[in-house]
Amino acid sequence: MSKLTQVFKQTKLCIGYLTAGDGGTSYTIEAAKALIQGGVDILELGFPFSDPVADNPEIQVSHDRALAENLTSETLLEIVEGIRAFNQEVPLILYSYYNPLLQRDLDYLRRLKDAGINGVCVIDLPAPLSHGEKSPFFEDLLAVGLDPILLISAGTTPERMSLIQEYARGFLYYIPCQATRDSEVGIKEEFRKVREHFDLPIVDRRDICDKKEAAHVLNYSDGFIVKTAFVHQTTMDSSVETLTALAQTVIPG
């Protein structure tokens, strides 16, 4: 059982997001420490990209700031190692678009693993479209011991889920239907159908901003993720202590 799957066995979890390099290498390390101290159970680090179209404007700007700080694949490793020097237990996920990882070879993926990354979520790289088709990148992740964190949605068919099963490890991100996301009955039914196909933990991918919304999501999801609220806080106040306080106000007691 992977470390990510194992940690979900203990409780329902909060995943906290930071864009790596936003504010500089040292700041990202200190911000990560602050979120962990605030109670974040899993940390997701965004690999900056020049065209992060799947993210909202505030997250996109954080990518721009990180690139302006000259965040590279090597300084990303330094950030991961810096976080691991502080905490060896909290799982770390790399969130990326495929382009920044496209030219990285198996050795770099192995270095990510050795530095302390546990899983990789590539937002714009789907699982293969047919049985028998292979995904070289997902194969490489598995070869070095990194969990591919895949995404499914309300529109994912049972046939498509069977293809995703081949590579999904750690947990799954679920993107709910807009029409049912605020209906507890509707969203619970969506999750029930997904759980018929997967033994993995399933996390609602919507971007949580407060404790009430987090508590609602935890009624049916194995966890929740906070992205924009944490990124916004880093732009409002360079003091990382405020991140600890913010995490404590978002995570249900």
UniProtKB/Swiss-Prot annotation:
InterPro entries associated with the record: Aldolase_TIM, RibuloseP-bd_barrel, Trp_synthase_alpha_AS, Trp_synthase_suA
Record's catalysed reaction(s): (1S,2R)-1-C-(indol-3-yl)glycerol 3-phosphate + L-serine = D-glyceraldehyde 3-phosphate + L-tryptophan + H2O
Pathway: Amino-acid biosynthesis; L-tryptophan biosynthesis; L-tryptophan from chorismate: step 5/5
Enzyme superclass (EC): lyase
Alphabetical GO biological process terms: L-tryptophan biosynthetic process
Annotated EC: 4.2.1.20
Protein family according to the UniProt entry: Belongs to the TrpA family.
Protein name: Tryptophan synthase alpha chain
Gene expressing this chain: trpA
